[in-house]
């Protein structure tokens, strides 16, 4: 076990990343996925991730909140992690990631989803100001991050779950008005640094995909769940304009046998071929309840189908 090494001194962090990068290399990846989340550095946060009492419930809370401290807290906490990774990155590999958490998630860390919905009705001005302020703060973090660590990365990304099984969590109009402008500022910085931007967003977000592609300028999108739309549907609809990351529903990784998984994956690849570039993997992050053998079956199947000898 090496997980605790990341909490050690700089040399221990480097040893952690040697093991961490070796895993991706041995699994056949060209990239290492690594991010550190902004929400972890927001004072009083946790209303989304840990269901704590929201730190912002009204205008007075908003005005008293230490917004200006967040960028400093972020880099004080995480700069050594990124530097350690930078020093041990294997030759020929790059990283995908950056400052984790998108605008919607960071707002919810302070208000909770229910609290945010109440503010939408009770104080529309505060509701708008929350997105504006989080957008400004996160953009400051991204600017500093790209100045320091852009060379470590081949693709920049954050995750911001805008939807659920059948719709977006906010109206499409609210996403366009309050979230899309903040995305634009960050993605512009990413593009100015010469990097492509990948958005991870769960849910049925079809109503805002045109905005994400045409207005924000995302270069790729990740997340798929068969109950919403099988991966080939995303590739067929958007593959001529953006890259698509994903492929196999994470639930299928849990339950399919290796022969069943091979049939599933071969079918997905066949349907996606000819519709632009895609990167095959799980439709969402691999949680701890996924059987290790299921994950290994996925990796081995894809590597075999692309012609590797395992």
Outline where the language-model segments fall.
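Glycine-rich loop at the start of a catalytic domain that most often binds anionic cofactors/ligands
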Residues: 2-7, 42-50
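Active-site loop segments of alpha/beta catalytic cores
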Residues: 2-14, 18-19, 30-33, 54, ...
């Amino acid at each position: 076990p090496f997980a605790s090494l990341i909490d050690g001194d700089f040399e221990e962090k480097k040893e952690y990343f040697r093991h961490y990068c070796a895993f991706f290399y041995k699994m056949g990846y060209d990239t290492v996925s690594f991010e550190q989340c902004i929400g972890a550095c927001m004072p009083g946060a946790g209303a989304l991730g840990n269901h704590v009492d929201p730190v912002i419930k009204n205008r007075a809370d908003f005005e008293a909140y230490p917004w200006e401290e967040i960028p400093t807290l972020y880099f004080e906490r995480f700069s050594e992690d990124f530097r350690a990774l930078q020093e041990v990155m294997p030759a020929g590999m790059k990283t995908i990631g950056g400052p984790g958490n998108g605008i919607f998630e960071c707002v919810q860390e302070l208000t909770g989803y229910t609290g945010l919905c109440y503010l939408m009705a009770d104080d529309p001005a505060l509701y708008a100001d929350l997105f504006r302020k989080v957008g400004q703060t996160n953009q400051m973090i991204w600017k500093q991050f790209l100045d320091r660590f852009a060379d470590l990365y081949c693709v920049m990304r954050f995750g911001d779950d805008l939807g659920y099984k059948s719709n977006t969590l906010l109206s499409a109009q609210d996403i366009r008005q309050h979230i899309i402008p903040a995305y634009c500022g960050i993605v512009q910085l990413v593009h100015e640094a010469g990097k492509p931007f990948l958005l991870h967003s769960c849910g049925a977000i079809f109503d805002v995909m045109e905005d994400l592609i045409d207005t924000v300028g995302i270069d790729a999108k990740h997340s798929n769940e068969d109950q919403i739309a099988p991966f080939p549907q995303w590739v067929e609809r958007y593959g001529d304009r953006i890259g698509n990351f994903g492929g196999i529903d994470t639930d299928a990784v849990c339950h399919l046998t290796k022969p069943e998984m091979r049939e599933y994956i071969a079918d997905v690849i066949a349907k996606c071929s000819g519709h632009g570039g895609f990167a095959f993997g799980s439709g969402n992050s691999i949680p701890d309840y996924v059987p290790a053998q299921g994950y290994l079956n996925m990796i081995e199947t894809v590597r075999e189908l692309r012609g590797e000898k395992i």
